Amino acid sequence: MALYIILLFAALCAGMALSVCAFGTGGKRKHIFRDIYFSVEDTDGIGVLYTKTGEYSAVLKIENPVQKYCADIDSYYEFTQLFTALAQTLGEGYALHKQDIFVRRRFAEETGGDREFLSEAYFRYFEGRPYTDSMCYLTVTQEAKKSRLFSYDGKKWRDFLMKIRKVHDQLRDGGVQARFLNKAEASEYVDRYFAMDFKNRIVSMTNFRADEDTVSMGGKRCKVYSLVDVDYAALPSLIRPYTNIEVNNTEMPVDLVSVIDNIPNADTVVYNQVIFLPNQKRELSLLDKKKNRHASIPNPNNQMAVEDISRVQEVIARESKQLVYTHFNMVVAVDADTDLQKCTNHLENAFGRMGIHIIKHAYNQLELFVGSFPGNCYALSEEYDRFLTLSDAAICLMYKERVQHSEETPLKIYYTDRQGVPLAIDIT
């Protein structure tokens, strides 16, 4: 009898050990940042991020092709065509994660050196003037098959290397400045996102505290605003890559989401734009099933759903459009003593005027923040954080503009830009 009791106790202990290994102890949230990356490796000068779930990612630093305040409608449509071509090049099993980062800085002349009195007085006049700087990164991620014991596949790895080089070439041919981050730069980029610090030379980490409304870190707080609520998709039926603003009684086109680069009280804003590329045949089959399910119950709401799905199927059949899953969010970082409600009101009012109602109950702040790490986009929930739409509509919600930076030239002439800070212009 004693032997049976000992065997039963040993079996229970073994079962508990297996359960802890497979499902954890319930404290995974405490170690959530440790479970993102496996390593960062250098592959022919390209820094490749490996996640612990088996995805590969390469990061390109790019410059958006549309000059801010250029008033050129065609350039916004050219951006849409370029990223549509990138999505078609990558195909099933890939994701595009574009991060536009806006940082409030204070002007400081970096060159130094001996100057004449007037030059010294000129730069001293602008010293400390606040302005918004921007940078843009594009991460290409290959999805890993979660059902396999060993996820490495040499053929898929070679396909990944080929596809990321094709993306780089397409961006260059489209007039977009792009280069791959190497191992050190990719590691630094991840660290800067983790600390939400894109302006200090030295990045320091600190403790995190996450609740249902914010993520706090040291002397700053972050709030993640998800753009689309999958339970209540309040989006306009027709969308363009630009919108019009009135300037001196004249309409001028600007980026559709240009409101995110001037959020009041915001110190840093990261606009995450993720496009997942699924199997097209499977998604069309699921759309057919969904349409039949709505058609089986005749009421006005179901009839509207059937008509919407039919229009989408017609566009796909006629114009060979691509179905994609998307996710858009904004990570807004402010000082710890700053009220975030002003940022919330600004975003709700600005997007509300465009017919877009941002989600009001994004209580999974930590999960959204972690899912927005470069290369970790597949950690976003398929059920709650991804929205099915056409690729053209998704790309319209991307940020397309760039601010002008000083040109690298030995002979510099300085002019002030629209933010009132000096820029070096090449006149050679």
Question: Language-model segments: which ranges?
Answer:
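Extended, folded cores of ATP/NTP-driven motor/assembly subunits in large transport
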Residues: 2-401
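Active-site-adjacent "gating/activation" loops or surface patches in catalytic cores
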Residues: 401-428
